[in-house]
From Swiss-Prot:
Reactions that this protein is recorded to catalyse: a UDP-3-O-[(3R)-3-hydroxyacyl]-alpha-D-glucosamine + a (3R)-hydroxyacyl-[ACP] = a UDP-2-N,3-O-bis[(3R)-3-hydroxyacyl]-alpha-D-glucosamine + holo-[ACP] + H(+)
Catalytic center residues: 244 (proton acceptor)
Pathway: Bacterial outer membrane biogenesis; LPS lipid A biosynthesis
A Pfam family reported for this protein in Swiss-Prot or TrEMBL: LpxD
Protein name: UDP-3-O-acylglucosamine N-acyltransferase
EC number: 2.3.1.191
Family: Belongs to the transferase hexapeptide repeat family. LpxD subfamily.
NCBIfam families: lipid_A_lpxD (TIGR01853), PRK00892.1 (NF002060)
Sorted UniProt keywords: Acyltransferase, Lipid A biosynthesis, Lipid biosynthesis, Lipid metabolism, Repeat, Transferase
InterPro entries in alphabetical order: Hexapep, LpxD, Trimer_LpxA-like_sf, UDP_GlcNAc_AcTrfase_non-rep
Length: 344
């Protein structure tokens, strides 16, 4: 059952000023969120882009989170703040109806005798918790998870079903790990002996800070000697690969299907778009934005926006451009020849 909150509680939670219309009070109850177009009685919506102002004027929402410049266009109660999208996120947290990944400790879970469990820990059916593991207060371990030897999981961290944490992995507080993610598998470390690959045991681990979120089916490899480190507040989308010995700075965001090769250091507050490939053994400074489909082959030491992806165009135009690209070296040589003849 969804919880309800009053408009005043909601305004206090998100840091907004409350403007009431006739018939509403600070005690008017809100039970859920919806879009401007579909919201109704007891629901709250938001407007963060003035392009949707026409929907604001017609909405049947109980209240709307918006900027002060949009207040005059609102026919219902309003929660006014500078960043309505952040307000929406905070309101969604308050009204979150997402279930727990586990309730209580299932009798079907396999838990080693020396595991340290904090208060209110939940472990789902068929989860395996190996020796030396420490689970802090309010940790949720979903069904089918594997928690390897000497893993440490911080308070309020939640693992959805079928997450794997290899031995000695460390997760901080308030982390969220989505299903089928693997943290702490071996990094891709091999030496070549006359054509034969010799495996290098990966002796480091993976350390996640506080408030780290990792999407479904992502992989973060353990370090070869030093550790792979994911800083506080980092968010990683689905199906990403983070190789061994990578260091990711605080509050960096990485979108889906991105690959970060080994021994890369990414700074703080970076945004990495989807399907980006980052070559190994390089540094990316703080406050860098890399657009989707880019390939990063050298270090970035200056904050800013970087791109190298090829946007889609009509096939006929692309084929013409491909022919021109194939002939580029010939055209370049012809230009040089013409320049030399002109100088004579």
């Amino acid at each position: 059952m969804n919880q309800t909150v009053s408009l005043q509680q909601l305004a206090d939670k998100i840091g907004a000023s409350l403007h009431l219309t006739d018939g509403d009070s600070g005690e008017t109850q809100i039970h859920s969120l919806s879009t401007l177009a579909s919201a109704g009685n007891g629901q709250i919506s938001f407007l963060s882009n003035s392009r949707y102002r026409s929907q604001l004027e017609k909405t049947a929402a109980q209240a709307v989170i918006l900027k002060s410049e949009d207040l005059s266009h609102c026919q219902c109660s309003a929660l006014v703040m500078d960043n309505p999208y952040v307000g929406f996120a905070l309101a969604a947290q308050l009204l979150d109806s997402t279930p727990r990944s586990a309730d209580g400790i299932s009798p079907l879970a396999v838990i080693a005798d020396d595991v340290e469990l904090g208060d209110n820990v939940s472990i789902g059916a068929h989860a395996v918790i190996e020796s030396g593991v420490k689970l802090a207060d309010n940790v949720q371990i979903g069904p089918g998870c594997f928690i390897g030897k000497e893993v440490s999981v911080g308070a309020n961290t939640k693992l959805w079903a079928n997450v794997t944490l290899y031995h000695r992995v460390v997760l901080g507080q308030d982390c969220l790990i989505q299903s089928a993610t693997v943290i702490g598998a071996d990094g891709f470390g091999y030496a070549n002996d006359k054509g034969r690959w010799v495996k290098i045991p990966q002796l480091g681990t993976v350390i996640l800070g506080d408030r780290v979120e990792v999407g479904a089916s992502s992989t973060i490899d353990r370090g070869a000697l030093d550790d792979t480190i994911i800083g506080n507040g980092v968010i990683i989308d689905n199906q990403c690969q983070v190789a061994h010995n990578v260091i990711i700075g605080e509050n960096t965001a990485i979108a889906g299907c991105t690959v970060v090769a080994g021994s890369v250091t990414i700074g703080r507050n970076c945004t990495i778009g989807g399907m980006v490939a980052i070559n190994g053994h390089m540094e990316i400074c703080d406050n860098v934005y890399i657009t989707g489909m880019s390939m990063v082959t050298k270090a970035i030491d200056k904050p800013g926006v970087y791109s190298s992806g090829m946007p889609a165009i009509e096939n006929r135009e692309w084929r013409k451009n491909a022919v021109a690209l194939r002939n580029l070296s010939t055209l370049n040589q012809r230009v040089k020849t013409l320049e030399k003849s002109h100088l004579k």
